């Protein structure tokens, strides 16, 4: 469990389906791109993203589980994202699944 973006104080509690804040969308996209490009160090060094990172991950407790998943990734694993959306403006519900196609047919 976890969230790429998890900023409860910034949430729009009255509108679950409001548009994501610009910073939350940018950060979520940055991390997803790092996952797709198999660049886990960018996810580890998320704080290099400055204010977008500080706003998106004000405390890392909900972000750290993602790093365990990336650390368990095998060569050839293909990431998929489902669900993949941001609720309340600042709460990413993006989940990452890694699959190894060559093992699925074995």
Please place each PLM-identified region on the residue numbering.
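Surface-exposed, charge/polar-rich loops and edge strands
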Residues: 1-106
């Amino acid at each position: 469990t976890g969230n790429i973006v998890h900023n409860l104080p910034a949430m729009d509690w009255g509108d679950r389906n409001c548009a994501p804040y610009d910073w939350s969308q940018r950060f979520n996209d940055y991390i997803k791109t790092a996952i797709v490009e198999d660049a886990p160090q960018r996810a580890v060094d998320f704080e290099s993203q400055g204010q977008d990172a500080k706003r998106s991950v004000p405390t890392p407790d909900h972000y750290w589980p993602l790093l365990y998943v990336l650390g368990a990734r095998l060569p050839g694993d293909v990431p998929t994202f489902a669900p993949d959306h941001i609720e309340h403006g600042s709460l990413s519900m993006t989940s990452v699944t890694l699959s190894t196609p060559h093992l699925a047919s074995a």
